[in-house]
Amino acid sequence: MDSKEGVVHSVCTSAASVADKHMLPDLLHGEERKVWGDGGYQGQTEAIQEVAPQAQDMTSRRTKFKNYIDEEAKRKNTTKSKVRAKVEHVFRILKRVFGFDKVRYRGIAKNHHRLCANFALINLYLHRKRLAVLGA
């Protein structure tokens, strides 16, 4: 998702057994300046640098080392979580407005096409006021 415009720029679907970190290169377009991710993307700095050389890795870091809790890392992770939470709004629209709460397995390709169409509609839905002003 683009942080300035607030639009979804890439959609990637996979089987439920595939970890998020394996899909990361497909989600990046190469012009990112910052990549935000949760703990599932930890340690993917090399993958990010391959696709988007200018991007900073802003993924959450581990805060607990043996018996020591790093308070500064914990504070930074809290800030990163607040930034990442803005992306979740798109998934609320996908589920509540467009009714994509339960996915019937129709094949990955068919589900992917359905998700692409829904996210295109979500981009229009999020910018409906701006588009109405431009159309008037």
Which residues does each predicted region cover?
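A short, flexible helix-boundary coil/loop motif
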Residues: 130-136
